[in-house]
Design a protein with these regions (language model features):
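Helix-terminus/linker motif at the lipid-water interface of multi-pass membrane proteins
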Residues: 30-49, 118-125, 181-192, 255-288, ...
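N-terminal transmembrane alpha-helices
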Residues: 5-43, 56-71, 75, 100-107, ...
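Small-residue-rich hydrophobic transmembrane alpha-helices
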Residues: 48-108, 145-164, 278-342, 373-387, ...
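Short runs within selected transmembrane alpha-helices of multi-pass transporters and secretion channels
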Residues: 69, 138-157, 164-172, 197-213, ...
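Transmembrane alpha-helix boundary and packing residues in multipass membrane permease domains
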Residues: 21, 25, 37, 74, ...
Length: 452
């Protein structure tokens, strides 16, 4: 598989890797969007506002696992490029076990402090009780979600983006079929109201993981849950040290982004539940553009790691340039569609005209800047492939904490709710400028070596 990867034209390798991952992100976003439509249309705007308040809280815990998976993905990519299958299993086993422990801790702590967290976020009083009820269920099913997210990241390290896509199809189909049935109590099921989407998501995740295990075993996949894989499920200090060296800064970055979203949400909540519902709707649309941009960056990082593992360092530059070009075509195209279809898209899950008009205006302010976000993410992804993460992460954190948040507060005071969204382009432009300078002036002059 490795030799075939390097024998193909780079653009073809990119697209074969990227296409299933982008489709996976679309499915994931679609699942969240359709669930929001179900809740908004069947339970009302207040219910949607209650669910929207959980987005940053769940993302806070997912950020830890995303960081862990990013570190493991680089190491697995290098080991896979060097054709060291035993090392691939060892890295995956140690990382997955740590991910399980994180999920259990997140479930306990998150459930205990759910009300305090949502109150601290300034969740509107008229939706607080519903938000807490939803949070309790969502956090208890979080371990299964985290394991699923982490395992799909590990699969990508060995260039398998098709299996995660097929598993997500299973998860999405089950979840979307169950959500309205649980909301209304169809087919003899108990009517669970606002908690329906969470329970349906749990059923979908468990179904997908069972199907994925069957598929990997049947295909003799290097990450199949067989005897050798379970033997590798141990907390190897050496491996985890290297995983955390790359993954921890990435996790910290994701947490800072999560915390920044909490601050943004707190600012939005000050404008009332209508603004909170608009925030949730805008987030859904933004996900359709931002996740594909991140997928391009992940692809660049994995392909770069495999090139390093195989000793093909001359491919690093072309991998970066191809990623930037695909970002222009794919992310840019989605941005254009977002502007053209924003009124119709937002109307899918916002029933009040005033709320939809507010959300449309906010979306138009920042949607274009996701192209800039994609550029900086791809540059950072290439550097991450070699294990260079600390400075790119610091750049991102400085731009979020030192630029975006102060700008959001100041612009909120000057322009009201729309000022909060004006801060996003400012931060993304800062990230792109600083990441590019570090790449050109420092990283390109460093010696690149395998990490494992």
């Amino acid at each position: 598989m490795q030799s075939a990867t390097f024998a193909k034209p780079l653009w073809q390798t990119y697209l074969l890797f990227l296409a299933p991952m982008v489709l996976s992100n679309f499915l994931q976003s679609m699942s969240g969007t359709v669930n929001s439509i179900y809740i908004g249309q069947m339970l009302g705007t207040q219910a949607l506002a209650a669910v929207s308040g959980m987005f940053p809280v769940v993302f806070f815990f997912i950020a830890l696992v995303i960081g862990l998976g990013a570190g493991a993905g680089v190491l697995i990519g290098q080991a896979w490029g060097a054709r060291e299958t035993h090392m691939v299993k060892a890295i995956a086993g140690a990382t997955l076990l740590l991910g399980v422990l994180i999920g259990l801790v997140a479930a306990v702590l998150g459930t205990v402090f759910a009300r305090q967290a949502l109150t601290g976020l300034g969740t509107p009083a008229d939706v607080l009780d519903d938000a807490v009820d939803y949070a309790h269920v969502m956090l208890w099913i979080l371990p299964s979600l985290l394991v699923f997210v982490l395992f799909t990241q590990l699969l990508r390290g060995v260039s398998d983006t098709l299996s995660p896509l097929l598993a997500l199809i299973v998860s999405t189909t089950v979840g979307l079929a169950l959500t309205p049935a649980l909301i209304r109590g169809w087919l003899g099921l108990p009517p669970l109201g606002i908690q329906s989407a969470a329970y349906a998501g749990l059923a979908g995740n468990l179904s997908a993981m069972a199907w994925l295990a069957w598929r990997l075993i049947r295909k003799g996949h290097p990450l199949a849950p067989d005897r050798e894989f379970f033997a590798a499920l141990r907390l190897d200090r050496v491996i985890l040290g290297k995983v955390l060296r790359i993954g921890l800064p990435t996790g910290v970055q994701m947490i800072v982004l999560s915390l920044s979203e909490l601050v943004i949400l707190a600012l939005v909540n000050q404008h009332g539940s209508q603004a909170t519902a608009a925030y949730g709707a805008v987030t859904q649309i933004v996900n359709y553009v931002q996740f594909p941009a991140l997928s391009i960056a992940i692809t660049a990082s994995i392909l770069g790691a495999q090139a390093i593992g195989a000793g093909h360092l001359q491919r690093m530059g072309p991998i970066l340039r191809t990623g930037l070009l695909i970002n222009v075509c794919l992310t840019g195209g989605l941005i254009v569609l977002g502007y053209l279809l924003s009124h119709w898209l937002l109307g899918l899950f916002l029933t009040e005209d005033s709320t939809r008009a507010m959300a449309e205006h906010l979306l138009h302010i920042m949607l274009w800047s996701l192209l800039v976000f994609g550029f900086q993410a791809i540059i950072g992804g290439i550097m991450r492939a070699s294990g260079t993460v600390l400075v790119p992460v610091v750049i991102s954190i400085v731009c979020v904490v030192g630029v975006q948040l102060p700008a959001a507060y100041w612009l909120d005071g000057q322009f009201g709710l729309q000022g909060v969204w004006m801060a996003f382009p400012v931060a993304y432009l800062g990230m792109l400028i600083l990441q590019t300078l570090y790449y050109k002036l420092v990283w390109k002059h460093q010696k690149i070596e395998r990490l494992i």
